Amino acid sequence: MKLHEYQAKMLFAQYGIPIPKGLVCTTPNEAKESIAVIGYGPWIVKCQVHAGGRGKSGGVRIVRSKEEIQEFAKQWFGKHLITEQTNHIGQPVSKILVEAAIDIAQELYLGCLVDRSNQCIKFIASIQGGIDIENIAKEKPHLLHQIILDPLIGPQLYQSRDLAFKIGLSSKKQINQFNKIFMGLATLFLEKDLVMAEINPLVITRLGDLICLDGKLHVDSNALFRQPELCKMLDPSQEDKCETYAKQHNLNYIALNGNIGCLVNGAGLAMSTIDMVKFYGGEPANFLDVGGRVTQEKVTKAFQIILSDKKVKVILVNIFGGIVCCDVIAKGIINARLESGINIPVIVRLEGNNAKQGIQHLVNSILNIRIATNLTTAAKQAVALVEGKQCLF
């Protein structure tokens, strides 16, 4: 789960990480009057969306008057901000953060993430930060310095000092400030079950102080049950509507960019199905795991979600019935087909618990449903149908 910048900064403040004075606003008039609380300008106004690259798309601006703040707010409230990290629709803007502008001497970078490849928590710091950090990582990897954080013993001051020296901090004042920021960010990361925390840029002001100008936090969605306060920070407007709808019905759905819809039981089998589709030259439209305790109604909901993606040309159903009853799945497929009225090809592979009964239900339905005897055949058929080829298998 992603958090907005203003939410991240609220948490930063709770953990002793310095941030600029600011106010989050929900109306143009509120934005205009925010400077009475913030103080003298100039100010920075920022659209709050779950995407990077806001500055390059006009979603971040420096302003010097009430009127400019109000103009910016009127321009963006109720609109969609499109950046290099969003789709062509963009993300809706319903909040704007107004902050005191900071006189910057240097931009640094500090981040923490779960490194799944190496099965560890990794801190990364760089002497160069800002909007081009991705390019720096690609073109100047020697500027990125890393340490491993052990969750069992927590962050250590010697690790903080090591990073501070590597990114060029030398004065006692700055090293002490960096230590406080490092320890605060690491503690926040561990206590709030984060998978990514980023301060970019972490700036040195003209007065030599360190302050966090922008921040990103991603929470482990699997740990939200023990983070009730973070659950309240979810902004559904920033989420994929299909994914939100799926969560409400206890379905694990992730939208992809292809045109072959997939309905599978079990995350491992779902990933194998996606791999098989890709292997034979197709592009999956989604990951969808209906789980073990699936009902006829749940299958119908799953079909509705898949069909809401207008790119989908074929639906591939791959069910291995253990706990799941294949005849229940079959009845759900038939109901979904009749309710939707959409006549795109559906390929079904059923194995296991009540598979014969399920297949018989599908055959008797006289609908445009093809039966596959194995996953290889099912994937080949799906790809062939998308490409407009005749299925010979």
From Swiss-Prot:
Pfam families: ATP-grasp_2, Ligase_CoA. Pathway: Carbohydrate metabolism; tricarboxylic acid cycle; succinate from succinyl-CoA (ligase route): step 1/1. Keywords: ATP-binding, Ligase, Magnesium, Metal-binding, Nucleotide-binding, Tricarboxylic acid cycle. Its EC number is 6.2.1.5. It comes from the Bacteria. GO terms for molecular function: ATP binding; magnesium ion binding; succinate-CoA ligase (ADP-forming) activity; succinate-CoA ligase (GDP-forming) activity. It catalyses: succinate + ATP + CoA = succinyl-CoA + ADP + phosphate; GTP + succinate + CoA = succinyl-CoA + GDP + phosphate. One of its GO terms (cellular component) is succinate-CoA ligase complex. Residues 9-245 form the ATP-grasp domain. Its cofactor is Mg(2+). Mg(2+) binds at residues 200, 214. GO terms for biological process: succinyl-CoA metabolic process; tricarboxylic acid cycle. ATP binds at residues 46, 53-55, 99, 102, 107. Binds 1 Mg(2+) ion per subunit. Substrate binds at residues 265, 322-324. Heterotetramer of two alpha and two beta subunits. Succinyl-CoA synthetase functions in the citric acid cycle (TCA), coupling the hydrolysis of succinyl-CoA to the synthesis of either ATP or GTP and thus represents the only step of substrate-level phosphorylation in the TCA. The beta subunit provides nucleotide specificity of the enzyme and binds the substrate succinate, while the binding sites for coenzyme A and phosphate are found in the alpha subunit. NCBIfam families: PRK00696.1 (NF001913), sucCoAbeta (TIGR01016). Belongs to the succinate/malate CoA ligase beta subunit family. This is Succinate--CoA ligase [ADP-forming] subunit beta. It comes from Baumannia cicadellinicola subsp. Homalodisca coagulata. The gene is sucC.
